[in-house]
Structure formats: C-alpha cells, structure tokens
Amino acid sequence: MAKHIIFDSEARAKLKSGVDTMANAVKVTLGPKGRNVVIDKKYGAPSITKDGISVAKEIELKDPVENLGAQLIKEVASKTADGAGDGTTTATVLAQSIFSAGIKNVAAGANPMDLKRGVDKAIEAVVERLKQNSRKISNSKEIEQVATISANNDSKIGKMIADAMDKVGKDGVITVEEAKGTETEVKVVEGMEFDRGYLSPYFVTNTEKMEAELGNAYILICDKKISVMKELLPILEAISQTGRPLLIIAEDIEGEALATLVVNKIRGALKVAAVKAPGFGDRRKAMLEDIAILTGGTVISEERGYKLENATLDYLGTAEKINIDKENTLIVNGGGKKEDIQARISQIRSQIENTTSDYDKEKLQERLAKLSGGVAILYIGAATEVEMKEKKDRVDDALHATRAAVQEGVVAGGGVALIRTIPALENIEVENEDQATGINIVRTSLEAPLRTIVSNAGGEGAVIVQKIREAQGDFGYNARTGNFENLYEAGVIDPTKVTRLALENAASIASLLLTTECVIADEKEEDKPGVGAPGMGGGMGGMM
C-alpha cells in the first residue's frame, strides 16, 4: 500500500489536530462536575460514561496522520490506567498542554531536543517534590475519601470499598461482579476458598444447603491421582481412631478409592469428603503448597520422596471449619504456623514484584490474598445494563485509585498538588535558553488540570488558578461545593501514584511528539461507489 509522508511543521500541525480532538473529547469528563460522554456501539445499547479511558478507547479518526496523534494520546491514558487505574483524564490534559505549548516554541525557532531535555528535567524535579508533599494513608476514612472521588463523588461506592478493605486488609483481593438485582453489596469470603467442589454428592452433610460441613478436620494433601484403596488404608485407619473428619485434596480420586470412601461415609464409619486439587500444572503445585502451609500439613508428593501408603497423622493439615459445595471449597482457620505463613506471603510478594506478566501477577495476588486474610466481592447492582456498565467502570476506577493511595500515599486533590510543585522548578540548572523554555512549558502545564476542572464546573480558570497560587499548603478550590478551603480536611485527595504516573506518561509522549520531524502513514482511502450501484438504479427505474 502506498504511504503518505509529511515533514516538519505540517507533520506536527496534523498530529496536533489529532491530539486536540482526542484530548477535548476526554477532558470534558474531568472533575466532580465533569460531563458524560455517550458512545454509540455497533451492537447493543449505547454506553454512557464519565471515565476518561473508556472515551479514549472508542476514538478513531478518519485522517491517518491525525489518527496517529490521537492514538499516541490514547497511549498516555492507557499507560496511566495500567499503572494506577485512574488519572487518565489528568494525563491527557497534561499531555495536550505540554505538546501545544511546545509546538508554538518549535515554530518560533526553538530546538525540539533542548525543549525535551528541559521538560524532562522539570518533570524529575516536580515528581520529587510531589513525593515530599505526599502523606501516608492512616485510616479507613481517608481510604473512603479517595474511593469516593475516583468513583465520581459517589459516597456509597467509597464507603463500600473502605469496608471491603477493612475486612480483607490492604493485601486482600477485592473483585467486582455484577449483582442479580439492583442492590449493591459487599460479600467477604474469609479463609482460603478455591474453585473445586465435592467429587460425589454422597459427601454432603447438610442436605438443605447441599454442602459438606467438616469441623475440626484433618486435611490430606496429595499431588497425584488416587485410584487404589490400598494406598489410602493406613492413613484412614489412623484417622478413624481419632474420630475426626477428613478432607482429601488430590489431583483426582476415582474408581475403587472413591467408591470405598463413599461407602464408609454412608455407613457412618468415617466422616470424609474429597475434592480435586485447584489449578493446573506448576500453579497447582504452588497452590497445594499454599494449602499445606496454611493448614500446617505436608504435600504428599513422590517427587519429594513422600509416599501415600507411608503417610501418618503428622503429614496432615488441620482446619477449624471446612465448607464444600458443588463448586467451591472453603477452609477457615487453618492450623499452620504464623511464621511459616508470613514467610510464604513474603515469597509471593517478591514474585509479584519480579513478574512482568499481568496474568501471572493477578494469579499471584489471588494466592497472596487467600493466605493473608480473604477475598471481598463487590456485587454491583443497577436497573439497566447501561447503568451497570457505567457503575462497574467507576467501581474499578475507585478500587485501583485506593490501592495506589495505599502504596504511595495521597496529596491534595483538585489539581492543587501539581500547583504546589511549581516552586521546585526555580533552581534547575540549564545549559541553554531552550531548556529553560522547556521548564516554563511544564510550569504552565501544571495549571492545566485545575483550569479544566474549574471550566467543567462553569468557573473562570485563570482567576481561580491565580488565587490558589497566592495561597499555600492544601488550600484549594473544591469544585463540587464551589468553596475555597483546605482540600485535605474536606476529603478532596488524590493518590500520589496516580498524579505521578499521569505527569510522567504525559511528559514522555508529549516530548516525543515535539521531537517528531517526519510522519509516515497509510494513504487515505477514497470512498468508492459500490459495485453494480448504477445498474441497480436503472433496474429499479424500469420496475416503476
């Protein structure tokens, strides 16, 4: 396919047009009084959103060069969403501001490479100051405030996320699912739950709930398939003398072994239940080891030299309560040693830090949560599918922002934190005038998010920015109430990580756009009339 090649100011002007189109569509959503965007879907109902990244993902421009500019801004939003889960609109506004100011200076003769170096130096200083101004999250109230703001000032969602985090701890897994009705609620699963149910309904002890309930039970953990009863006999005889129930977790239990267990359960000779091991391959081995550590048992594995027929009660784990239904097994209050569990948690944490795969990271975090206190499920209810999708997006945003706040602390919200970093730009050493111009570009751009928040709230940006620059500390403009106040005390706070990533990603892409001298894109395809269209017209005329 033929390529369209443009250079210099023409290339940058086209890119700017794409950047502006994308940014202008996204930035209407910024702030507590930001507006909604309605997105037409090819199939199904249109979606209504106030989530920056959802808007950005839908935009594709007709002109190929303008589209390149738009897609690069989409990259800013995506990177920020991936890293912090929120701050996509702030990042977009910052990128547009840095690029727009930079392109004017390049047109006036500034060296793009020196401008970029100036911008990079400024961002480094601003990020450092941001970290200094950051405060650690100290209580549940602050978690609720962060979540409320990220959920577009929905205090119900904020409270729900704070409650969930209280119950499962900062390392606990919180998942978001659609509720069957219109009610939104939190359900907490304490202990370790995995998605494997009983191998036979004959193991059920509570016929009303169709669950197997075992109290003060032993747990046998084996990584191989058990089909011959002879292997199980010694350990079953030892357990029957204690009178305590037994849960068997193995790769599979079938044939003679399963039949014998069922018969013994029905006769009342043995309180027993059996489930398959969770996961597959290496992940299964790791999860069995987690269960063993949590319950104080040992994985009976021939790879390690342990044989099932030689197993004694010392090999078994214990738990205060075990609930098994058709699909899930829940182990509560395992008998493992605290120091062993903590060592395993530390090991999983270091694996999370070292992995580059998002999928692996998610699975490791699930394992971490199961070891460290449980899983909270947020069931999101809504009257319509459109409302459900919009609400779910907001809950996801709030959840990510809350985690970011726990990691790196919080700063004053409402665009004020960025303005408070401006003094950090005063004493940066530069090599030439163009680098100083790059620093000034960042100085101006740090005001852009606040201007946009005020503009969306129907105010005059320049006046309010000036008033806030003259003040100090956390004093700022609360766009929701229209008052000037201490934003930290008013609960208008942002996660430091969100603000930092928005800055870094915006500056990175905007600087690259500034230093672009040539753009190569596919030629724009002309709209061609459909084949046979003229003939159709003639035929239809004859029919009339």
Swiss-Prot record:
<keyword id="KW-0547">Nucleotide-binding</keyword>
<comment type="function">
    <text>Together with its co-chaperonin GroES, plays an essential role in assisting protein folding. The GroEL-GroES system forms a nano-cage that allows encapsulation of the non-native substrate proteins and provides a physical environment optimized to promote and accelerate protein folding.</text>
</comment>
<dbReference type="InterPro" id="IPR027409">
    <property type="entry name" value="GroEL-like_apical_dom_sf"/>
</dbReference>
<keyword id="KW-0143">Chaperone</keyword>
<dbReference type="InterPro" id="IPR001844">
    <property type="entry name" value="Cpn60/GroEL"/>
</dbReference>
<dbReference type="InterPro" id="IPR018370">
    <property type="entry name" value="Chaperonin_Cpn60_CS"/>
</dbReference>
<dbReference type="InterPro" id="IPR027410">
    <property type="entry name" value="TCP-1-like_intermed_sf"/>
</dbReference>
<dbReference type="GO" id="GO:0051082">
    <property type="term" value="F:unfolded protein binding"/>
</dbReference>
<dbReference type="GO" id="GO:0005737">
    <property type="term" value="C:cytoplasm"/>
</dbReference>
<keyword id="KW-0963">Cytoplasm</keyword>
<dbReference type="GO" id="GO:0140662">
    <property type="term" value="F:ATP-dependent protein folding chaperone"/>
</dbReference>
<keyword id="KW-0413">Isomerase</keyword>
<dbReference type="GO" id="GO:0042026">
    <property type="term" value="P:protein refolding"/>
</dbReference>
<keyword id="KW-0067">ATP-binding</keyword>
<feature type="binding site">
    <location>
        <position position="414"/>
    </location>
    <ligand>
        <name>ATP</name>
    </ligand>
</feature>
<feature type="binding site">
    <location>
        <begin position="29"/>
        <end position="32"/>
    </location>
    <ligand>
        <name>ATP</name>
    </ligand>
</feature>
<protein>
    <recommendedName>
        <fullName>Chaperonin GroEL</fullName>
        <ecNumber>5.6.1.7</ecNumber>
    </recommendedName>
</protein>
<feature type="binding site">
    <location>
        <position position="50"/>
    </location>
    <ligand>
        <name>ATP</name>
    </ligand>
</feature>
<comment type="subunit">
    <text>Forms a cylinder of 14 subunits composed of two heptameric rings stacked back-to-back. Interacts with the co-chaperonin GroES.</text>
</comment>
<feature type="binding site">
    <location>
        <begin position="86"/>
        <end position="90"/>
    </location>
    <ligand>
        <name>ATP</name>
    </ligand>
</feature>
<dbReference type="GO" id="GO:0016853">
    <property type="term" value="F:isomerase activity"/>
</dbReference>
<feature type="binding site">
    <location>
        <position position="494"/>
    </location>
    <ligand>
        <name>ATP</name>
    </ligand>
</feature>
<dbReference type="InterPro" id="IPR027413">
    <property type="entry name" value="GROEL-like_equatorial_sf"/>
</dbReference>
<dbReference type="InterPro" id="IPR002423">
    <property type="entry name" value="Cpn60/GroEL/TCP-1"/>
</dbReference>
<dbReference type="GO" id="GO:0005524">
    <property type="term" value="F:ATP binding"/>
</dbReference>
<comment type="similarity">
    <text>Belongs to the chaperonin (HSP60) family.</text>
</comment>
<dbReference type="Pfam" id="PF00118">
    <property type="entry name" value="Cpn60_TCP1"/>
</dbReference>
